[in-house]
Amino acid sequence: MKRKAAALFGALCLVTLAACGGSDDTATEEVTEETTAPEESTSEVASLAGVCPDTITFQTDWNPESEHGFLYNMVGEGYEVDAAGLRVTGALVSKGQDTGVKIQVRAGGPAVGFTSPTSLMYSDPEIFLAFVSTDGAVQDSGEFPTMTVVAPFNINPQIIMWDPATYPNVKTIADLKATGAKVRYFGGAAYMEYFTATGILDSKQVDGNYDGTPANFVADGGKAAQQGFATSEPYYYQNVLTDWAKPVAYQTIHEAGWTAYAQSLGGKPDVVEANKDCLKLLVPMIQQSQVDYVTDPARANAVILDLVGQYNNGWLYDAGQAAAAVELGLSNGLIANSPDGTLGSFDLERVE
């Protein structure tokens, strides 16, 4: 794994803050401020004290999982867990060193009744940055404009998956159209509107009632396809879900033509503007944390599993899933440098 990470992330350099929100159709512009990622060294990390909020709060989009590992990797030892509030608070560390402020990471998705991170951020001023997809940012730009500042995932891990035994000739999402198979997804997803509008899938075959559980997929015996994450479901369905216990086939929605960024970190425009000096220091730390995490995920995964146990909210997640998510993120090219050679930067052609 360390060799994979070194090959992918040999050069951390510049990141340009990209804005999602505005009055035009694309709702995308470029912020001129640049941030410089830290050089690999053992030198003392920059202090965030007095530059950033005393506690930097991140709102995620799901329960604790490896896809959020770069955040949990920044939570220092001796962290405090609020099991009722489904959040963890600790010293914000970079390369193991205390930065002088605290970090709080909040669970999302089913933990918050599926309220979007953007909505939560607008209702709670304590949230500094939240998970924002660039397509969602465009959709919400009228009511809830956001500015995305870093993209830990270069490729959206969202997939459509199917049973290869039931559909041996299906190799892509587009191939599902001819089969007429039902395709379940979370209703309102912009990518599905794109798939049906462009004829990749038939509007009659898509079903927006996916509930995030495997029950219907298993009950259908593989006759229906459904959404998932390339870093999660392929491993889970084959190795953990005893009611299925066999491989699934899949394609990322990115490969099928929907190239928006997912799980980027963004904030309210006024907050981003007011905290430019903070972000110049913080964004490179986030970049570095993603590199450090995929190079050696053991400690952060231990934090994730500890939180899963303490939250005890019905979310089932084990060490095998946590480790597999990192491997799948790397092997599928989801965690990778942008075309400019930078981890975490935005290719603006993808969000226009």
Model-derived features with residue positions:
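Bacterial lipoprotein signal-peptidase II cleavage site
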Residues: 20-31
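Secondary-structure end/capping motifs
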Residues: 275-352
